[in-house]
């Protein structure tokens, strides 16, 4: 995995948002993060961090130069540890919810896909989420 880093202080937030969404959709991109930072002369800027599989590094860097105003990109090769994960469908009444289970040392955790419960009203959303996650973690 390669981490690409750069800062932006001369591109509007709206335009950068569009640019990063396009980058996020590229094959091989694992994650895109942006945060606010302070740069030279006390200027506010966006610090951008992109995780990409090694094989896609060149294409993603080219797209970063195309879509953003950055003049340079730092890259770092990373090793990473990944938990075993699996996806499952849980039925609750007539509704189906996607879940992701992770095998942690000595434990199994489950998270409901937020898009599947987002349509539920507040209290029901939270209780449905808790019920599914508690039920499936015990299996």
Indicate residue ranges for each PLM-predicted region.
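Long, contiguous binding/interaction regions
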Residues: 2-45, 49-139
